[in-house]
Amino acid sequence: MASSSSKASDSSSQRPKRPDQGPSGKDAAGLVVLHGKLAQLKRQVQSTRLAAIKERVEANRKALQVHTCALFDVAAAAEVASRGAEGGNALSRGAAEGHCRLVGWDSASGPGERELVHVQEENLVAGTLVLSSSGGSGASHRTVVQLAKLPVVDKIPPYTTWIFLDKNQRMADDQLVCRRRIYYDPIVNEALICSESDDDVPEPEEEKHVFTEGEDQLIWKATQDHGLSREVLNVLCQFVDATPSEIEERSEVLFEKYEKQSQSSYETDFQLFLGKTMDVALDSFDNLFCRRCLVFDCRLHGCSQNLVFPSEKQPYGHGLDENKRPCGDQRYLRRREVYQDTCNDDRNACTTYNTDSRSSSLKVSATILSESEDSNRDEDNIKSTSIVETSRSKITNSEYADKSVTPPPGDASETENVSPDMPLRTLGRRKISKHASKSNDHSPDKRQKIYSSPFPFAMSVLNKQSVPEIGETCPDSIESAVDQLPSLDDPNKKISTKDMCAGSTTNTTENTLRDNNNNLFISNKEHSISHWSALERDLYLKGIEIFGKNSCLIARNLLSGLKTCMEVASYMYNNGAAMAKRPLSGKSILGDFAEAEQGYMEQDLVARTRICRRKGRARKLKYTWKSAGHPTVRKRIGDGKQWYTQYNPCGCQQMCGKDCACVENGTCCEKYCGCSKSCKNRFRGCHCAKSQCRSRQCPCFAASRECDPDVCRNCWVSCGDGSLGEPLARGDGYQCGNMKLLLKQQQRILLGKSDVAGWGAFIKNPVNRNDYLGEYTGELISHREADKRGKIYDRANSSFLFDLNEQYVLDAYRKGDKLKFANHSSNPNCYAKVMLVAGDHRVGIYAKDRIEASEELFYDYRYGPDQAPAWARRPEGSKKDEASVSHHRAHKVAR
């Protein structure tokens, strides 16, 4: 066995040969050898199995012996305790000493002479019972028994076991309900109801062979040594009770099983997980997560939904107070604060220095506004200008470059482990000059000439468009930067702090530093990207999309345990080549990743530009109640004469056309669609003032919809103290009254015996007119399935089906809430209404009049003339029911 297993493991990397891949013919001697090997292996498997069975039987025998001994000890102790107890057996004593003797006779008479005849005389008025008996001697005995009168209790009505649902659920595809269900007719004869068609009954499948562990060993041994030819399959059929096709399928399963086990064991699941992209890692989550209910494994919309990506993304929130506080020692804001304190102390000494050489002097005038609260360094509205004057050229054109936060320079090791003493550079916007001479037009690269500072501290980590602000440069930092400067043309040549503050450097030094900066920039970029896995890069891009360039929030929420805030900031401003408006020359290094990040950043900049523009001036929109949706659709729904249409999100981009799924179905586009907010088919909510959302003036209420806080302007929900950025609660305590179903603000419903029929629903607290009572929940089934179930429910004299829309019917027979017990009445105190809540149709129960506490709830089921049960029909002479809508089955219909 050991040799065979080792040989099997060695050959596990080779796939077994297929019948057409094997040799053309097998030698008879080879088949004989294979037959002998399989027979020997079978005997070994049988002997091993026999030994295992004997061992298990012995273990079970010992365990049973211990268990029986324990039970015997318990029984013996109980017997001893019963013998020593006083009074004997209480049951025997109670039987011997009865409360009354029903029959009496002479105990002295012999047993053969007793012939008892019982006579009962009932006196219901007195509540007594006289029992008389006569023996063989002719003596009679009478015994009077006092009867106890029990109170009359009504029979408990039939009750159906049901499962509580707080929201609707869709019926499973493979669910079988009301098939072959037994019911009892009035003659109490058992009958059987099958489905409408016998084709629905699945045919019994053939039993498949279940392979044992020993059979797997035989198949694996034969396929690894001799392949999977037809001769080998025929030989295996002699040892395994299965067909050749089943053996072939089993060999494929065994190959996949052993192939996975033969993979490298040193790679952990975490390492394999990091090697994947985010799309591959979240593939199962995309199928299980519902983007409408924001839950996994949604019972309402199901799994494997069509992914609809919105064309307009929500702007990320910013301006939180907590972003000002450093999240830890690895937060780059803490390094920046330490660096700014150091610069403030040394800046006074730098300003007292006089520059005498005007031919090469640099006059710097910088005006820096306060930084934004979200620590977003390249999108703050910071205006910083630098006027550079030189004796050789004159500035003729300028443009602004983005502001960036740059970590300290260093080699590859310093990029990963940043010293706490090394501050980050804060660079402002500045003007860069462009030569207007002819020689520049004939330059090889034909680009703008950028006046870069010869400071290796900043230039070693910035791209060609990032120039440090000279006014922010401190002598100490420059001195340390010069010490860390790599070797130039002249290794003994040093640049003094005085010359660097004055800006008196030669062109040779500038060119050398510029070339050195480019080399360091490319090397640092290559190193940093190589240390970021594919999953980490995807998470970083997703963080840019959600939080902007806020390294703290990205590291805390998406890269927790993987990267620190400092590493995210370093990666953002070292390798974020897409943040520059112009492409870099080293595009081949970043590849598609730079293009993807550039797409994120461009979209982010456009969104932030719109936000900043809105802050400057309030935009007044032309909005009327007619623009909220389609008046024809709203009128049709309000009249209740046609079916409601099931909503399915469309995947249109930007504007919807004639091919839009929502337009074809006659529904409005909702917030779950992929089209933009400016789509003409989009429902834009309401702009109602206070206390107007419960009137027909509200577009949402008129269209039988509930207000949506994400769509309606003045209908928003506040829960909390505002610490998470949500809007504070209004001072007057106003809240939109058309969001009861969305917020589940239902009343307390009680369940009790009804005076009308069966069980009923009762209100606990008094309610006013049009108040929301609760939701009628249940299973979402098709109309065809509802017809099948309705036949059973009609025989049981119950109705739990509720027409929802043209695609689904609510069935609350097995799953629902307590409002399913509300009975029908021709004069109801409640009414049912179908409302569209977040794209889903839901049934709400509302008070028709004022209802007092503990009062039973009734609403009109809207039965057809011949569909209502006997207890729900109107008295003769009433013709109001004739106007009701006729249905094929007893269904509840909302108005």
UniProtKB/Swiss-Prot annotation:
Compartment(s) where it occurs, according to its Swiss-Prot or TrEMBL record: Nucleus
Domain of life: Eukaryota
Catalyzed reactions per annotation: L-lysyl(27)-[histone H3] + 3 S-adenosyl-L-methionine = N(6),N(6),N(6)-trimethyl-L-lysyl(27)-[histone H3] + 3 S-adenosyl-L-homocysteine + 3 H(+)
Molecular function terms, GO-annotated: chromatin binding; histone H3K27 trimethyltransferase activity
Comp. bias intervals (Polar residues): 383-399
Annotated InterPro entries: CXC_dom, EZH1/2-like, Hist-Lys_N-MeTrfase_plant, Pre-SET_CXC, SANT/Myb, SET_dom, SET_dom_sf, Tesmin/TSO1-like_CXC
Compositionally biased intervals (Basic residues): 886-895
Gene3D superfamilies (UniProt xref): SET domain (2.170.270.10)
Pfam family for this entry, one: preSET_CXC
EC number of the protein: 2.1.1.356
Function summary: Polycomb group (PcG) protein. Catalytic subunit of some PcG multiprotein complex, which methylates 'Lys-27' of histone H3, leading to transcriptional repression of the affected target genes. PcG proteins act by forming multiprotein complexes, which are required to maintain the transcriptionally repressive state of homeotic genes throughout development. PcG proteins are not required to initiate repression, but to maintain it during later stages of development. Involved in histone methylation and transcription regulation.
Similarity remark: Belongs to the class V-like SAM-binding methyltransferase superfamily. Histone-lysine methyltransferase family. EZ subfamily.
Protein name: Histone-lysine N-methyltransferase EZ1
Encoding gene, per UniProt annotation: EZ1
